[in-house]
Amino acid sequence: MIYGVGVDIVNIERVERILSKNKEGFVKRVLSEYEQVLFAKKGDSSTYCAKRFSAKEAFAKALGIGIGKIVSFQDLTICNNKQGNPYFIFSAKLCLYLVDKNIKKAHLSLSDEKFNAMAFVILEIEN
């Protein structure tokens, strides 16, 4: 059964401007430590950051809360499996919250094109 759905879209040029002004601050605030390591290796860093920002916002929307109340950007890490499909890794704190809400699965889809990055999240609970 679906617990919640969240979607978010981010303008990549906006993220690019933020990175040009305060790269270190934005990266430390939005990306987990693991994501920061991958970010350092990326050629298209603004798209990478925009997709992660969008995914974390969409996740918070699917929970029905905003970033900062229960979940922070640091509580979520976005990884990719061998086929390139994105998935979430949760902090221990967030895992406890999800268990309390009976949320068993999180589905994530990411997309980008020239100007925008988008994320779509579905959270499932057990019947």
Swiss-Prot record:
InterPro entries: 4-PPantetheinyl_Trfase_dom, 4-PPantetheinyl_Trfase_dom_sf, ACPS, Ppantetheine-prot_Trfase_dom. The keyword Manganese does not apply. Keywords: Cytoplasm, Fatty acid biosynthesis, Fatty acid metabolism, Lipid biosynthesis, Lipid metabolism, Magnesium, Metal-binding, Transferase. Mg(2+) binds at D8, E57. Its cofactor is Mg(2+). Its EC number is 2.7.8.7. It catalyses: apo-[ACP] + CoA = holo-[ACP] + adenosine 3',5'-bisphosphate + H(+). GO terms for biological process: fatty acid biosynthetic process. It is found in: Cytoplasm. Its main location: cytoplasm. Signal peptide: none annotated. The keyword Lipid biosynthesis applies. One of its GO terms (cellular component) is cytoplasm. GO terms for molecular function: holo-[acyl-carrier-protein] synthase activity; magnesium ion binding. It comes from the Bacteria. Belongs to the P-Pant transferase superfamily. AcpS family. Transfers the 4'-phosphopantetheine moiety from coenzyme A to a Ser of acyl-carrier-protein. This is Holo-[acyl-carrier-protein] synthase. It comes from Vesicomyosocius okutanii subsp. Calyptogena okutanii (strain HA).
